[in-house]
Amino acid sequence: KYRVYNKQTQVAILAGMRFPTGQTNERDEFGFKLAADDQPGTGSWDPIMGLAISRPYKQMSFDANASYRLSNQGSQDTIAGDSFSYNLATTYNFKHTMIARHKLKPSLIIELNGIWQEQVEFNNLKDNNHGGTLIFLSPGLRLSLDDLAMNFSLGFPLLNDFNGLQPEAGIQLFTSLNWLI
């Protein structure tokens, strides 16, 4: 991650790698090996690149990020499909409150979260029932206590534009716990 900073706008260039850490040889109850797209891992090394931009304004901040994952061939001659994720967020930061010498700072957040997923490819054949675009509207709350931040949000699907026959996404609960070091 490379970060450019000034008082008005913060920009970060993101780069990373998704490592093949998940199992690729799981079997069903009858002993048959699961298809590659049903395995916990893909068995591929996938580079990720992206960009994040943030701009504070008074008690608010406006944030955007996007990243692209280039999927490589993994187990069972399968390519899980490239993906592109993108997020837009607005945060309203309330004034902090002191509680027993600890600074509590609540924030309200509203986000648009999107992901596009390419079709899975098995032995050079595309699976028409994989991939597509999904966009969520996600209102949420962040509670910061000194260097610890807890995030909670609900994602309501705005767009379920999947390829082929796939179940639609429902409401998602997102949580995170962050410690600033």
Stretch-by-stretch model annotation:
Residues 1-81, 144:
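Outer-membrane pore/translocation modules
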